Amino acid sequence: MIAQEYKKMLGAKSVIREMFTYGTERAKEIGKENVFDYSLGNPSVPVPEKFTKKMIELLETESPVALHGYSPSLGIDSVREAVAVSLEKRFGLPYKKEHIFMCSGAAAALAHAFRAVTVPGDSILTFAPFFPEYNPYVNLTGAKLKVVPPDLKGFQIDFEKFETMLTNDVTAVLINTPNNPSGIVYTTETVKELARIMEKKAAEYGHEIYLISDEPYREIVF
């Protein structure tokens, strides 16, 4: 028997998915060049030529087992080291290999992060509007996703509502900037005030409140 909760989740309506399916079917009818698909986040920008050449080189010279086999649980050491060096260079923070956990995509990374900082009965706080798949990722941990209503003036954070909802059961705050679906980027002032309130509440409750920052669109600039 299929669990009813999972069956309900799989059967939930997704307007974005419906738009994508419709766009795919229309492309077959009138040609792909005549369909502008703004549904799923599939970037159309080509990958850097340097990356493509390196992939071809590895396919032609490396052992298939090394390329396609299992990696260590935390990721290949040399890759983790390279990511740490890149992050330190770009953001000026003291990242080390030990801080890096490689995942197969952002969804897996979020699922691991949620599981790492919650136990059943805890809550994670995020802000509307938000990526709807956060809900099942959090629910699978036994925790609950609580949503702070949006600041409709500028889609930054309504700090009065945020502080009210940052209760003792909240173990993590999830932000997404640039935001999906609004495209809003949080200002420096917004992030600093967010951190101030989180630190104050963590001291008040006597436990850590972690900040999880989902940034898949950070590198995309128009």
What are these regions (language model features)?
Residues G41-S44, P216-I220:
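Short, internal active-site loops enriched in acidic
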Residues I2-G105, H112:
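N-terminal small-domain helix-loop-helix segment of the aminotransferase-like
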Residues V65-G206, I212, R218-I220:
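Conserved core of the PLP fold type I
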